[in-house]
Amino acid sequence: MASSRILITSALPYANGPLHFGHITGAYLPADVYARFQRLLGKEVLYICGSDEYGIAITLNAELAGMGYQEYVDMYHKLHKDTLKKLGISVDFFSRTTNPHHPAIVQDFYRNLQDKGLMENLVTDQLYSEEEEKFLADRYVVGTCPKCGFDRARGDECQQCGADYEARDLKDPRSKLTGKALSLRETEHAYFHLERMKEELLTFVEGIYLRPHMRNFVIDYIKNLRPRAVTRDLSWGVPVPGLENKVFYVWFDAPIGYISGTMDWAASIGDPDAWKKFWLDDKVTYTQFVGKDNTSFHSVIFPAMEMGQSLPYKKVDALVTSEFLLLEGFQFSKSEGNIIDMDAFLETYSLDKLRYVLAAIAPETSDSEFAFQEFKTRCNSDLVGKFGNFVNRVVAFAAKNGCTELSHPQLEQQDLEFIAEAQKLAKEAADHYQQYSLRKACSTIMELAALGNGYFNDQAPWKLAKEDLWNRVRSILFCACYCQKLLALISYPIMPETAWTIWGMIAPGSLDLRSQDPERLQSIWTEAFFDYSEESFSLKEPELLFTVVE
């Protein structure tokens, strides 16, 4: 039996820059669509997200910007929260890894892993700056790549040849901040023995949902596990118990932010223990949405961390990954100028246009591309030509002919067949949402709009009106409005504003919009909603849903 309680998380956005369309399509729009759909089904949904606020990239860029670390992450936390709100991402609580609950639970995770014999302190050689009097983590280091000889290679990866390595392997390493040469010194770090958990992890991933093309990647990753450092020589982060001047590596503390973020939510509603009903109850269904570059952390490392705890933390049931979204064939990059100003875009084009196109091109199993020409084509062909045209022509015809109150139609066989086909497509859309396919859901939405348009054309009520066959005209309009009611229903997870507008125009008697939150429609997707026998419609003046993109 499916769980009535649904926990949803999407990858915590790193507080080191603005969000772009690639981020939105990869983790936040898919999670929002799924959350909205599950609420329609009447599930108790909790969608948690928040800023990932520790790590080297943050400290380095804050220093380069002349800002304090907290000041820097505060800036991006607010920006991310505002961006998600503008995009209609219905996150229930947007927390941050600097929340007051986070340090204690991260340290508790670490101690439990120590108690299980899965942590070990090892002494290794690390790069040290005599001038700055501290060890430098990889992003603070530049030098000559040991593979290709590129002389401005980063401390963890060469931008020229793509090689990855330890910072100490660089030739002529120097500080990124001062340019001074670095030396090697011994330092102690804690290592997580992931390789000791291979069999347990292989069994675990057999039982969770992964996109088929990702499963082999995850299995290979598990088979090649090795000890992994969980600590760094930084001042910004969660302090490590028993190791002076060390903080936890961001990959270790960040996923625990899903739990501490839920604690933060529980505190905000005045029920500090409310987090437990989502994280300590195995009957909950837990779905995570991440980009493909986060797959290993969420499919293997975070579950391994949870397995080593004394509390039975809920592990992921479905890990929904996305490939990369490219911009005109290239990766989104602020430094390269390959970016779209999201605020400016939304000032020009409606939110639902953007949400629909991003959903229709979602990089679910392979990289996809955002190109303005395709955006224009999909808006004008799909949203204006098919979807908007169907809704507008029906409501406008009804208003023009005074047929605004519709109920108890006299249905013919062709009407019943049309209604049955509309119901079938609506249920197909539900399957696509359950299977995390935004692309297929978009296709089905357009199929239903095309079905409605075809029915209205075939029945040609304007001809019947000339013959004064008004009962038949009203029956056709009733069926068309019923189709629009379902069209709004299956569109709502992707285009919530548009769905709300359609329902407002046709005013189904079965739907009391006054009692609903537009952002969190609850318990609408029911058998009663699909029943047409007692339905009625009270049509209002038509509103233009979409305008042509020039």
From Swiss-Prot:
What positions does the entry give for ATP binding? K334
What does this protein's record comment on cofactor binding? Binds 1 zinc ion per subunit.
One annotated GO biological process: methionyl-tRNA aminoacylation
Q: Which InterPro entries match?
A: Anticodon_Met, Met-tRNA_ligase_1, Met-tRNA_synth, Methionyl/Leucyl_tRNA_Synth, MetRS_core, MetRS_Zn, Rossmann-like_a/b/a_fold, tRNAsynth_Ia_anticodon-bd
Keywords (alphabetical) are: Aminoacyl-tRNA synthetase, ATP-binding, Cytoplasm, Ligase, Metal-binding, Nucleotide-binding, Protein biosynthesis, Zinc
Swiss-Prot/TrEMBL cofactor(s):
Zn(2+)
Position of motif 'KMSKS' region?
331-335
In which residues does the motif 'HIGH' region occur? 13-23
Protein family membership: Belongs to the class-I aminoacyl-tRNA synthetase family. MetG type 1 subfamily.
According to the record's subunit comment, the protein's assembly and interactions are: Monomer.
> What does this protein do, in the record's words?
Is required not only for elongation of protein synthesis but also for the initiation of all mRNA translation through initiator tRNA(fMet) aminoacylation.
Name of the featured protein: Methionine--tRNA ligase
The encoding gene: metG
